[in-house]
């Protein structure tokens, strides 16, 4: 009896320890989903209220927009799974009809057609205008940035073009100067050539005009005629003068 009593008293202690281990494991398992929730990515689309209001407003159907049309618009514009969001969309439609934000033109519950009420339209306009202002500001800032970048690029291009033009003009000036120098050299060479030619022609002319120095003639001296003394010179014979009358009278 004593042995059985000891065995029965010991068994509950073991069971309690096992239950304590189970509790610890369940606590750890419960702690892990919290970390998963914290790491979950935020949704890439706005809340269902804004999406439904925007879809009804942009569809602009006279008889109201149906649930299918709203789903299609949300899936196309916001690129999300409209089937998963269907229960949230239905819930919002019912609450909006009850609050007076939406008007149900057809059907009952969430299966009919819906339109925005006047108060909802008034409320939606300032929100839309604020969004438009923000988008305009963003677009203006982006346009200014693009203008700045384009202006900087144009200034850089203009500077590069100006540098290229300057380099081209400098090269052209150098070429012109070289050509001028070559022409001047050619002119100088021509001048020097003409001067040399003139000098040579002048020398030739001077040499042609200079009288030639007569060379001494080496003629043999001819023997002079020697007049012999024996040959008497011919004397002029004087004719007798005519006797005058006085002489005749004697």
Swiss-Prot record:
Which subcellular locations apply to this protein? Nucleus; Chromosome
A GO molecular-function annotation: nucleosomal DNA binding
User: Region Disordered: start and end of each range?
Assistant: 17-53, 104-250
What lineage does UniProt assign to this protein's organism?
Eukaryota, Metazoa, Ecdysozoa, Arthropoda, Hexapoda
Keyword line:
Chromosome, DNA-binding, Nucleus
Q: Can you say what this protein is called?
A: Histone H1.3
What CDD domains does this protein map onto?
H15 (cd00073)
The record's annotation in PANTHER family points to: H15 DOMAIN-CONTAINING PROTEIN-RELATED, HISTONE H1
Q: Basic and acidic residues compositional bias: what residue ranges? A: 120-133, 174-191
Q: What does this protein do?
A: Histones H1 are necessary for the condensation of nucleosome chains into higher-order structures.
Q: Where is the composition biased (Low complexity)?
A: 27-42, 138-161, 192-234
Entry-linked InterPro entries: H1/H5, Histone_H1/H5_H15, WH-like_DNA-bd_sf, WH_DNA-bd_sf
């Amino acid at each position: 009896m004593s042995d059985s009593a000891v065995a029965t008293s010991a068994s509950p202690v073991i069971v309690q320890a096992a239950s304590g281990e189970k509790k610890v494991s369940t606590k750890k398992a419960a702690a892990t989903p919290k970390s998963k929730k914290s790491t979950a990515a935020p949704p890439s689309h706005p809340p269902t209220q804004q999406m439904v209001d925007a879809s009804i407003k942009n569809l602009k159907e006279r008889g109201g927009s149906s649930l299918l049309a709203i789903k299609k618009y949300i899936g196309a514009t916001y690129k999300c799974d409209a089937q998963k969001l269907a229960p949230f969309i239905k819930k919002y439609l019912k609450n909006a009809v009850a609050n007076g934000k939406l008007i149900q033109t057809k059907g009952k519950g969430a299966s009919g057609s819906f339109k925005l009420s006047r108060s909802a339209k008034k409320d939606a306009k300032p929100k839309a205008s604020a969004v438009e202002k923000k988008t305009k500001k963003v677009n203006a800032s982006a346009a200014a940035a693009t203008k700045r970048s384009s202006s900087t690029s144009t200034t850089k291009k203009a500077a590069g073009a100006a540098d290229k033009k300057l380099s081209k003009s400098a090269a052209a000036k150098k070429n012109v100067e070289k050509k001028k120098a070559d022409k001047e050299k050619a002119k100088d060479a021509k001048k020097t050539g003409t001067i040399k030619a003139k000098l040579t022609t002048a020398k030739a002319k001077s040499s042609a005009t200079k009288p030639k120095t007569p060379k001494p003639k080496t003629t043999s001296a001819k023997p002079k005629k020697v007049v012999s003394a024996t040959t008497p010179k011919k004397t002029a014979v004087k004719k007798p003068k005519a006797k005058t009358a006085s002489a005749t009278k004697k």
